[in-house]
């Protein structure tokens, strides 16, 4: 309401957000609203908290640091900020870990220092769909994922 003054637009937002289903996952409006709503958080995390290595897509976030204690303190500050300022909560499935050994699972890929792989589950789903005779659009979608995931051997097997 700070940014939008148009009554019709505000009514539409209220109607969508307050509906029984809430914002549908994957809907373009959901992505835009999440990015818009979390813009203040983005500024706070960088300017006030001094975080330099931070990635976010909608409500999925990754923070990088050499210090686990810094990340734990940051997590505490994030929970407080999101609760008090934006009326949001952090799911309890967050993780703080060293990335050298296991990589970062984010947006369908697992990223390591020297390579990017697609998730194991994604590979399994793709193989299953190929066996069942998936349509062209599904196959091309998966091939697009493989293209960005250092998956030359997997592509050759297929």
Where are these regions (language model features)?
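Right-hand nucleic-acid polymerase module
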Residues: 19, 72-73, 90-158
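Short polybasic/polar patches that bind polyanions
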Residues: 47, 84, 105
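Phosphate/oxyanion-binding loops and surfaces in catalytic or ligand/nucleic-acid-binding neighborhoods
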Residues: 3, 7, 85, 113
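Short aromatic/hydrophobic-glycine micro-motifs
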Residues: 50-51, 87-88, 109
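Aromatic side chains
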Residues: 37, 54-57, 81, 106-109, ...
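A common structural junction motif
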Residues: 79-88
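Conserved polymerase palm-domain catalytic core
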Residues: 1-58, 62-78, 95-101, 153-157
């Amino acid at each position: 309401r700070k940014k939008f003054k148009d009554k019709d637009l505000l009514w539409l937002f209220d109607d969508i957000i307050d509906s029984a289903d809430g914002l549908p996952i994957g809907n373009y409006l959901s992505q835009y609203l999440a990015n818009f709503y979390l813009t203040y958080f983005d500024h706070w995390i960088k300017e006030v908290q001094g975080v330099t290595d931070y990635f976010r897509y909608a409500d999925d976030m990754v923070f990088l640091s050499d210090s686990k204690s810094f990340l734990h303190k940051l997590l505490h500050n994030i929970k407080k900020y999101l609760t008090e300022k934006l009326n949001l909560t952090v799911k309890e499935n967050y993780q703080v870990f060293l990335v050298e050994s296991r990589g970062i699972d984010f947006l369908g890929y697992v990223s390591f220092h020297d390579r990017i792989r697609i998730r194991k589950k994604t590979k399994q789903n793709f193989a299953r769909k190929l066996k069942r005779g998936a349509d062209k659009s599904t196959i091309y979608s998966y091939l697009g994922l493989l293209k960005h995931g250092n998956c030359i051997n997997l592509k050759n097997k297929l």
